From Swiss-Prot:
CDD domains with a match to the protein in the record: LbH_AT_putative (cd03360)
Active-site residues annotated for this sequence: H125
UniProt pathway: Protein modification; protein glycosylation
Family: Belongs to the transferase hexapeptide repeat family.
Statement: the UniProt record of this protein carries the keyword Transferase: yes
Phenotype upon changing H125A: Strong reduction in catalytic activity
Molecular function terms from GO: acyltransferase activity, transferring groups other than amino-acyl groups
Positions annotated to bind acetyl-CoA: H134, I155, G173
Name of the molecule in the record: UDP-N-acetylbacillosamine N-acetyltransferase
E.C. designation(s): 2.3.1.203
Superkingdom of source: Bacteria
Function: Acetyltransferase that modifies the UDP-4-amino-sugar to form UDP-N,N'-diacetylbacillosamine in the N-linked protein glycosylation pathway.
């Protein structure tokens, strides 16, 4: 549910457009797009509307999140009404989390700040998705999976139950993780192997 009638969306690419759709689905009446340009400043005199960061790149999203937070803006979550979220799941409040249409988050899963859960992704029971990670369209984490911070799970990738993926790792599109990966890396294929 929208907290203000207007929302700032930082990022005006295709990802920004889908964030606008989710914001309007939540009841925001107007989305004000902001994007990079030389000398951009967040003035304290700007109206304090809700704020969302629509940047797909994890590292850039994290840096902008810190900058905007320091300037007193409230960074909200955008959660599409079609998402299915267990009452026992933990989604950090006011943490810049994006939950797209038809996402499923099951019992006692935890979603940390700055996470993107893209369309139709599935986060099963007791999973943890670390800060500023991005779970792409149709990606699935089976029960009790631990995804580190700043990770990227490619489109239609899959992580089998009880496995973990180290911080700053990438699981390629269509890949299936079948064993723990405790050191960061890029993993592709079925079964997923380090590149």
């Amino acid at each position: 549910m929208a907290r203000t009638e207007k929302i700032y969306i930082y990022g005006a690419s295709g990802h920004g457009l889908v964030c606008e759709d989710v914001a309007k689905n939540m009841g925001y009446k107007e989305c004000i797009f902001l994007d990079d340009f030389k000398g951009m400043k967040f003035e304290s005199t700007l109206p304090k509307y809700d704020f969302f960061i629509a940047i797909g790149n994890n590292e850039i999203r994290k840096k902008i999140y810190q900058k905007i937070s320091e300037n007193g803006f409230k960074i909200v979550n955008l959660i599409h009404k079609s998402a299915l979220i267990s009452p026992s799941a933990i989604v950090e409040e006011n943490a810049g989390i994006l939950i797209m249409p038809y996402v499923v988050i099951n019992a006692k899963a935890k979603i940390e700040k700055g996470v993107i859960l893209n369309t139709s992704s599935v986060i099963e029971h007791e999973c943890v998705i670390g800060e500023f990670s991005h779970v792409s369209v149709g990606a699935k984490c089976a029960g009790n999976v631990k995804i580190g911070k700043n990770c990227f799970l490619g489109i239609n990738s899959c992580v089998l139950p009880n496995l973990s993926l180290a911080d700053d790792s990438i699981l390629g599109g269509g890949a299936t993780l079948v064993k723990n990966q405790d050191e960061k890396g890029v993993f592709v294929g079925v079964p997923a192997k380090r590149m």
